[in-house]
Amino acid sequence: MFGMSIRKFIILSALIVSGCISHPETIDIDFDSGTEDYTPLVRKILAEHPAGEVTIRFGAGTFDFYPEQAAGSYLCVSNNDNGYKRCAFLLEEMRRVRIEGAGEKTQLRFHGAIVPFRVARCEQIVFEAFTIDYDASFIFEGLVVGNDPRTHSITLRPLDPERFEIRSGEPWFTGYDWASPFGENILFDPGTRSPYYQAEQYEHDQKKTLQAEWIGDSLVRLSGYSSRELPPVGSVYTDKGPHSTNRRYPGFSFYKSAGVEVRNVTLHDSGGMALIAENCRNVVCSQYRVEVPPQSGRMVSASADATHFVGCSGKIVLRACRFESMLDDATNIHGVYMTVVDRLSGNRFGASFGHFQQEGFDFAEQGDSLVFIDRADLGVLGCGRVEEVNHVNENYYIIRTGFDLSAIPD
């Protein structure tokens, strides 16, 4: 009898506990031809759910997002370009948030200088069943229809001539609210949709200024082309702008978050990494695709890596994904080094990054363990637990650890 009472109590307790588990609220957003910008609506929904616990479910249709009313934040994103960003979906310190669509029938289209998704210090975040694109690519593309070794010039037919401009005689390409001079460039073979073999022989030296002129309504001549070989007729010239300014708008930016999943999502364009995760734990990409839109005529999807993971832990899962036509790696998984530049005391030192696109990275925090190595041979010099970190600026941190550096020679 007593045992039966205990069993009843356990069953009753389980029922009571399960009944207390809350379920995230679901908010459906249907396409409305009268809504030009869905950014304010999404910002309002997220503001009304500061802790998360919400599912935002988009129906079929193309949903547009503009930067004017997007939430802003200064972002230091590793291997991308730091700066103040407008973010269409800005999730901070939230848990159990889902952004869903109706599969291929749902397109989220972003306009101009805007980061689609920023997730910071969150848990259990899911993106599922939609397509991401921009109104205008962050890449200039033009078919080479002529070249002249005598004048060091090439003639292009721009894929989007309305986005090409000539400013002070030099070539620029534009978007909704941005404009870029020409810079880093690479040549594609339209037959194979891959870069030309030994493509560097066709790359224009960015230190040399190109001059541009219209030839009729649809052709552009670029003069002063400086390369070992001129791009052959029939190739596709692509340009993503100057180094240090062409990785400003990653598609997905995840920071210090856990349990983030991207499922059945297609990304057609991004002005930086398609997906970057920093100091995250357990990130899963399943049926995540980075590719150009069908029948678009484009050679390039994302302007950098399809996926990139920095300082992450737990599991990184890439399952049944497809990455093509981006201008960098399919995936890149690594940590970060800092250089000791000042010895302030035995266990206190100043440190800087070795690459400008890692500046501002959250390198370490109290309780982490650091390994000190000799940069000449990567030999381990010692280990120490972090006691304090002071971010003086993006490229100078003062760090105190339990390891005494005074015995280590310069």
Which role does the model predict for each range below?
Residues 13-22:
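Hydrophobic h-region of N-terminal signal peptides that target proteins for export
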Residues 134-135, 141, 145, 159-215, ...:
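Ser/Thr/Gly-rich low-complexity blocks that favor extended beta-strand/coil architectures
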